[in-house]
């Protein structure tokens, strides 16, 4: 298991030039230098909590009254997180978007046309269909209620993808998303535009907005209304969404003196999809846990893994032929006072020179039809494909 706290006095190639960027409706946070790197996954929380506390404490003598931790946290075992304590920040909060000139400047850039040399889907469609069938058998036997199976698409491009240009397109095409870009070492970079907030904590107030079940948007207004109406009325989709909400209620209730959860979900849209979402707000008990400790208790929700969680994890390990790495982890920031904001790592990709890895997941419940439940995989991959200047047909 990779666990590491590295000081920047002896930087390694795998952690040089962080150039981290995270944006949300709360503002923009960026950093270009680091004091510490932590790679421990969330499944080792006692060790991770100790390492974070030590790294934040070490940043105070350098002049940071309220140091920040930024980056991406891997939730599942078998791989590394990528968490940084910046060496210096202009403040201890995200800068409001209106004050962040990088946003407007990047959005005006254009991605140059590129050409796909090869495409590899992992797993192939036939193997994915077999995994869905195995999941349906597990549901029928009462062993599982839901599982989320994912697909990786590996593209080889004629020209290397420019991370700055791709990020500009992501921000322009998905202005209300949670945008993120961070280095993974050896020239690799994770970036994306997630529609889903896992958790935000600010001065004792907690907020989460889980998304579960989706449908592809239509180009015609009449059909668009029908798609949205059918999603909101679907018993199967409502059932799957309720699994997520019930689990979040179970986790948050002991930590909150107030917790407001709507009785039914509402519709939320991105540029390609309609989602069922439920905004949940509350107030933490006095002296309660930090945003990151709560996030690690919440994640992975049934929307990212399945239910029951441990059985779904085991099923995924048995069926998926690749490691998800940081895909389906969480990305964001927290400060030394327990405040912060973390989004789910979806609608994302890893850029590595001429090669790009894209990821998409599908929630499977009883009644799902192989090979995919809900939108086609190309629809969820469409966020990154559009930012890369590629056609959606690449993913079909």
UniProtKB/Swiss-Prot annotation:
The gene is amoA. It catalyses: chorismate = isochorismate. Pfam families: Chorismate_bind (PF00425). GO terms for molecular function: isochorismate synthase activity. Involved in the synthesis of amonabactin, a phenolate siderophore containing 2,3-dihydroxybenzoic acid (2,3-DHB). This is Putative isochorismate synthase. Belongs to the isochorismate synthase family. InterPro entries: ADC_synthase, Chorismate_C, IsoChor_synthase. It comes from the Bacteria. GO terms for biological process: biosynthetic process. Pathway: Siderophore biosynthesis; amonabactin biosynthesis. Keywords: Isomerase. Gene3D superfamilies: Anthranilate synthase. Its EC number is 5.4.4.2.
